[in-house]
Amino acid sequence: MANISWSHFLILMLVFSVVKKGKGDQTDKYCTIIIDPRTPCDLVDCRLSCYTGYNGVGKCIASKASRTPNCVCTYNC
């Protein structure tokens, strides 16, 4: 048993160094909101509004192919 190869040692170190996330973490909770749905999306304004209002990331996303895109803000709840 004293003769452990280097690869076995590395595998054991990898197994024991894994950190598991708890189920109670709030870091995985993201919310989305449509900012001003009546106006077409301008990417610069969308990102700025989302960042300043919600500290999130704004993207212009169309709900269907033929529709004008809306500003969708994704932020940490």
Curated annotation (Swiss-Prot):
Mind naming one GO cellular-component term on file for this protein?
extracellular region
Concerning InterPro entries, the annotation shows: DEFL
Q: Which UniProt keywords apply?
A: Antimicrobial, Disulfide bond, Fungicide, Plant defense, Secreted, Signal
GO BP terms in the entry = defense response to fungus; killing of cells of another organism
- Cystine pairs annotated here are 31-77, 41-60, 46-71, 50-73
Q: Which subcellular locations apply to this protein?
A: Secreted
Q: Write the signal peptide boundaries.
A: 1-24
Give the family, as the similarity comment puts it. Belongs to the DEFL family.
- Protein name, per record: Putative defensin-like protein 158
Q: Which organism is it from?
A: Arabidopsis thaliana (Mouse-ear cress)
